[in-house]
Amino acid sequence: MHSTPTNLMTTASLPVDRPFFAYQHEWNSGARSRNRVLTKMRQAGADFFFAYEALNDALHTGRNQIFLGGTPASALTVKTYMSAFIDQAAAWTHLGKIKSGKAHLELPNGAVIYFIGPESLAAALHGNVYVSEYAWADSPRNMIAIAKGLSMHKRYHATYYTTPSPNPEAWQEYQKLIASNSTTSMTFTADDAAASGATLATGAALFDDEWLNDMKKELSAEDWKMLFMCEWPQADKEQAA
């Protein structure tokens, strides 16, 4: 029996104005476990891509999707992306009537996509969960505990994606996540970005050596390693101890 991606992903029935980058597709095709942990550099397009992935899966499978952000406002950013995808697809296909609430989207097949923060009363919700930037939350442990409760049923999965932070609690929770046998762990650094060959619609490179050098000059060595090379500061401290 062949393993299947964590979430169904096809651009054929949900067209978008521009294709995603190959490295973003790998976040989907490389995920074969119930839990997916992506440690990524800043501004890698994770919210944007996962918004599409979740919408696609909800339309095809009827599964609920839940975006859990450090604040309700950060989760609602994903709702903006999804609304744009729906508008783009409307020019090519009929998706049916989609109901839009303040913090949710209800699809014609009954699937509901929620956008919540860690203080939300989410006990009654269930679905595939996307946890954005948990390492920068006031309590990473609390966010992850909420996500586990929301995605506990066998047919659901959880995706945790973040840039590393100096928070010791975040480092501890990250280690717990990747230690599980049911977890696929992935990393996407600035070096990976530069090697990806990703280009803009104009044909210009999205990431190149000049960009790498400019960013290194603007940040301290410690911040560069943490924010763009996905190195947890606590890992260096443990190795030095």
Predicted regions and their residues:
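Phosphate/NTP-binding elements of NTP-utilizing enzymes
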Residues: 2-241
